[in-house]
Regions:
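Toprim catalytic domain recognition across nucleic-acid enzymes
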Residues: 2-203, 211
């Protein structure tokens, strides 16, 4: 079934077969543009919009982050050269406390039984991919048909084109892998160098104080 909106055509056949479709954006303002482009009578709810077979929700930038060393071992909260370099065998992640409410809203939506399709509408790039993949990981999304919307602008025509041509999320696994790798590199460099430099300055200050 083709739906025409202001000279733009959107294929709604897939979404009409069974369950609902979720469109998850990187920020509220972008989510609003997607909602406008869909021309659906949405009802505003806490952290999302819903109308008919469509749900539009959003992140607020990053909702999930990499855990600090003390999440691996409480003893690592105390800085010491003896614990450097810190290189975990497996990396841990956690929901950012300040945005936990929105994460839980998004998690509940993505894992709803009546949701069949998830259209990933985070920014088209490595960081946008990473933002969604972390949410997907921590929310435990399984059994959904995930499609990646890749657009160059937020015009209605571009949004509808992006939805119609959305590819399976697996097409972007390499991009996701590179995002995870870059984040791990930044994390290891940041944690180890900041601790080493800070601890060095602390020891130097203590030495001067004792002279």
């Amino acid at each position: 079934m083709l739906q025409e909106n202001n000279n733009c055509v959107i294929d709604t056949e897939m979404r009409d077969i069974m369950g609902k479709s979720v469109y998850i954006a990187e920020k509220p303002s972008v989510a609003q543009e997607f909602a406008k482009a869909l021309h659906v009578n949405f009802t505003r709810k806490d952290g999302y919009l819903e109308g008919g077979d469509h749900i539009v929700t959003w992140c607020v930038g990053h909702l999930v982050t990499m855990s600090y060393p003390d999440a691996y071992d409480p003893n690592l909260k105390r800085w010491s050269f003896d614990t450097l370099p810190f290189i975990p065998k497996e990396f841990k992640y956690e929901v950012i406390p300040a945005v936990a409410k929105q994460f839980n809203i998004v998690k509940d939506i993505l894992t709803r039984d009546d949701v069949e399709y998830i259209y990933v509408c985070t920014d088209s790039g490595r960081e946008g991919e990473y933002i969604y993949r972390l949410v997907r990981q921590e929310a435990g999304v399984k059994g959904k048909k995930e499609r990646r919307v890749w657009i160059d602008s937020q015009t209605e025509e571009e949004i509808l084109k992006g939805i119609n041509t959305a590819k399976d999320i697996s097409e972007y696994d390499n991009l996701s892998d590179s995002a995870y790798l870059r984040a791990k590199e930044d994390y290891l460099m940041g944690i180890n160098f900041s601790r080493a430099v800070s601890y060095t300055h602390l020891r130097a200050h203590e030495t001067k104080a004792n002279l």
